[in-house]
UniProtKB/Swiss-Prot annotation:
It holds the Pfam family DUF677. The keyword Cytoplasm does not apply. It is found in: Membrane. Belongs to the UPF0496 family. Residues 30-41 have a biased composition (Polar residues). GO terms for cellular component: membrane. This is UPF0496 protein At3g19330. PANTHER family: OS04G0405700 PROTEIN, UPF0496 PROTEIN 3-RELATED. It comes from Arabidopsis thaliana (Mouse-ear cress). Keywords: Membrane, Transmembrane, Transmembrane helix. InterPro entries: DUF677. It comes from the Eukaryota. The chain crosses the membrane at residues 222-242, 246-266.
């Protein structure tokens, strides 16, 4: 279990100052959770600044290099080999499935642990989808846009004279190969990202509801404890005043009677348990919020890429339908050249945000797994 909980970021600084995932400070306790929630959902939250910071963190570059190496291992002699997604998942997702299962196995099964288990499962499923998308980015580059770029480098620019027949035949042959390439980004109506987002939204709703319940319990205990202290002081004063009249041996009897009447029995362990639950729930809720926002961004980028690639494939089919006509081929190449740079930028943006997802999901899972096993002080004030 110790190895599972010792997920190491790229550097010691990465574990302290580079975390793009907002989460509660352990020292500030439960009192900070409401303020942190407000800061996360605040309309003044500068997303662009946070993203710029996240893309510069050591942990982000560590995850990116690790994923890049893993994907590159699937390319042999320029032939893209479909890798085992589950194997890639075990190398990218930290803490991995085995560590999570071991941690959950040693925790008493309650509604809370069921919610936490659901959180880990959803984050794993979404990471599996993101791994597929990451491979699709490389597939689009390798099979479609690298051959097109090679073709652009051979052909003259728009301002130069018309191409000859040999170049026209070369372009037509390249179009024939590219026409067989399937769009790796499914249409928005068919891919399952929206189901994952719905699961995350439902999970956050359940976590927040459970979080409010735990906070109410601790507040109740806090106020009841304060009330019982005042009641005990009053009882002691009453005993002292009565001591003039009552024999001293009546003091223990009065305390025994006054204690239960002033305050119900509030076990110390109950408050400690609820405070621990609050920290776990807060970590899971914040992680779910951030990850769902990441999925929103990835979802939009995938939708744009699907549309852009479909447009390029339409142009390629149009060029094939017109045959080996020099003028038609040259016009199609002009249109493809114009859309090439925006599409390559979109591929880069999607790749960046998928790597950011890997960074955030690992931090969220590591934080929550640590919270499950972290002793929590009982003196935190709500």
């Amino acid at each position: 279990m110790r190895n599972c909980l010792s997920f190491n970021p790229a550097s010691p600084e990465a574990s302290l100052g580079d975390d793009p995932l907002p989460h509660p400070s352990l020292e500030s306790g439960v009192a900070s959770t409401s303020r942190n929630d407000a800061s996360i959902s605040s309309p003044t939250f500068n997303l662009s600044r946070e993203l710029a910071h996240a893309f510069q963190t050591p942990s982000y570059h560590d995850v990116r290099s690790r994923v890049h190496v893993v994907v590159d291992l699937t390319q042999i002699h320029h032939r893209l080999i479909q890798p085992d997604i589950e194997l890639l998942l075990s190398q990218v997702l930290q803490p991995n499935k085995e560590c999570v299962q071991e941690a959950i196995r040693h925790v008493k099964q309650t509604t809370l642990t069921n919610l936490v288990s659901t959180y880990f499962q959803h984050s794993e499923d979404a990471t599996r989808l993101c791994l597929n998308l990451y491979q699709n980015v490389h597939s689009a580059r390798h099979h479609l846009y690298t051959p097109l770029l090679d073709l652009f480098n051979i052909f003259p620019g728009d301002s130069l004279p018309a191409i000859d027949e040999s170049l026209c035949d070369l372009a037509f042959d390249v179009f024939l190969k590219l026409d067989t390439f399937e769009n790796p980004f499914s249409s928005p109506e068919s891919y399952s990202f929206r189901d994952t987002q719905l699961c995350f939204s439902q999970l956050k709703h359940n976590l927040d509801r459970r979080l409010r319940k735990s906070r109410s319990r601790v507040r109740l205990i806090h106020h009841a404890t304060a009330g019982s202290s005042l009641c005990l002081v009053a009882a002691v004063v009453a005993v002292a005043a009565s001591a003039v009249v009552i024999a001293s041996h009546a003091l223990p009897i009065l305390l025994v009677v006054a204690g239960p009447l002033c305050s119900p029995y509030l076990p110390h362990s109950f408050k400690r348990k609820e405070l621990t639950n609050i920290c776990q729930l807060n970590a899971a809720s914040k992680g779910t919020f951030v990850l769902n926002k990441d999925l929103d961004t990835i979802d939009r980028l995938v939708s744009r890429l699907h549309t852009g690639i479909e447009y390029d494939k339409f142009l390629i089919r149009l060029g094939l339908e017109r045959g080996r006509d020099v003028h038609s081929i040259q016009e199609i190449l002009k249109l493809l050249r114009k859309s090439h740079l925006p599409l390559t930028h979109q591929l880069k943006d999607l790749e960046d945000h998928i790597c950011l997802w890997f960074t955030n999901v690992n931090k969220a899972r590591s934080l929550l797994l640590t919270e499950i096993h972290l002793p929590r002080p009982s003196h935190v004030i709500l």
